[in-house]
Structures are given as structure tokens and as C-alpha cells.
């Protein structure tokens, strides 16, 4: 349900209100509360910085081959411990190779990235946590059954941004809300009961250093944005890139914009870098519930079915006009319309 509570209302009160309106959300609300408690604990560890030890220290490699930082492990252990006390049957985590079985008879499954943006740890930049809550499917013949359903089956989704303030962005399936951690009380409080992504924008977020590897539709779209009022987009754009998915998406949810992490020609990047279950699908639900859109360029994100828990997917999300425009480029629309022949031959991003 949409939250109607006043600004400053504690998360627990808002969750209780949602359950009163829709008792079917009782278990999901319990999971969100558990994640929130873990986020408070993780926020405290991050807030101590180097005084709490070298949180950026390298360790083993995770399921995707990334080097695990000390804080990756701390966050994973914290949230897993919290979820053991919640109605969660299984967890798919970025930091675990296989699905973790918690409470076999519980009704829910959680896909989670315990620490997004770990490359930012050592430089005091924003990091976060991303999660999606789904029904647990009891199928002995398919141990991945709970996670091989479309993203549209998610009951709730959210992320936490550990930045200047620690923020929780949450949807329970009707609207997207934001909460901020009140450090004096150690709990999250409502700051926006209805986040809304404007339909149009003049901002895009993409890692432009990979431009030479992009597929033609992405090159064409970004090139047209860079042409500003002289090009077919007919407006001047700004570029933003924080190298932290949660921070980039929070900006989109707060003031609009379009975020792109496409697949590209680099080895192992054909489907981008982001993981479908515990990064892309939760973000897509949050953005859609705030009035935006999310696609991989050709297919609505929430219609995609994962084949494995660490599967990747390209992501284009945010303001609907721009997301629709990018999809048009992918569909082979007319991205050359409005370009001068000279620019088409010598544009900065032409391969």
C-alpha cells in the first residue's frame, strides 16, 4: 500500500501500517525490519572508517570472481544473521556461490547484494546494500525454483545507501518510499512517502570510459545526448557517474535521470556487469513503483527470468521518456535522424 504516515514516522510504524492494510505483507515486513536492523549495524561499522580497521582489505574471491573486501564479508555475515531470525527459507547472496538454506518451511526467499560498490570503501565514497523479496517455491526437483521466476514476482525490494546519511529506499509493491537513519535513536524514519521519477530528464549516468566498447544503439543514444540542442534530443544534458549503483539510482529516484549499464564488447561483458536477481530486478521494481521504467534495451527488466542466481543483465532505467528512447534505438528506430553527415562520420564516439 502507499504510505500515508507523516515525515519522521519510524520504519517499524510504517511497516505496521502496511500490514494493517494488507495482512499478506506481514512476512515481507518482518524481512524488511530484519534488513533494517542489519543496515544500522553495518552503517555503524562504516561510520568508524579506518578507526574500525582496514575495511577495504582484500580477501578471497566471491562467486563472480571479484575480490572480497573485509567489509563485504562483514556485511554478508551481518545480514545473513539478521535473516535467520526472519521468515526466510533461502537466500541468494552475491557473496555466496550457492543458495543458502535458512528456515526451510518459511514462506519467503531473499536475493541480496550485502555490499554494493565495495571499490568505494577505501576512498570514503557511497556504498550500499540491495535486496529483493520473493515467494519461496518448494520444489525438491529444482533448488533454484524461488529465484527462476520473473522479477515481477517480487513482493518487496529496497536498497540502503551508506552516504552522508544512511538511507533506506523501499517498496512493498505500491509506491516507493525513502527513510533516513536517525543516528541518535538508531532507527530509520520516513523522509519521502511517495518518491516520483519525473518522466523527462536532462541527466544521464553511464561510465563513458567504456564508450569504445558499447554497442551501436548505446553509442548513438549517448552521442545524441552530447549534441544537446543541436541534435535530435533537442536539449542539453549533464552526465553523472558515481560508480555506486545505489547512489546513482537514489539520485534518479530523487530528481530524475536515466541510468545505463549496458552490455558491451569486452570479454565477459556481453550482458553487462550487474546481477539480475540481487541488483537489477530490485532496482527495476523500485524505479517502476516510482513511476519510471527499466529495460535491458529490448525487454522490460521485470519480465526477465534468471537461469542462475549470479546471472547478469544490462540495465537502462529512470525517466520513462529517456528509457523509451533508448529502447527505440535498440529496436533499430532512426537514431541517425537529425545528424549531419559530417557528424555521422567523425563523431567522437564513432568506431
Swiss-Prot record:
Presence of the UniProt keyword Cell cycle in the record: no
Note on cofactor: Binds 2 magnesium ions per subunit.
Keywords, in A-Z order: Carbohydrate metabolism, Cytoplasm, Hydrolase, Magnesium, Metal-binding
Positions in coiled-coil regions: none
Pfam families to which the protein is assigned, alphabetical: FBPase, FBPase_C
Residues holding Mg(2+) 1: 94, 113, 115
Membrane-traversing stretches: none
UniProt record similarity statement: Belongs to the FBPase class 1 family.
Subunit comment: Homotetramer.
Protein name stated in the entry: Fructose-1,6-bisphosphatase class 1
Primary gene name: fbp
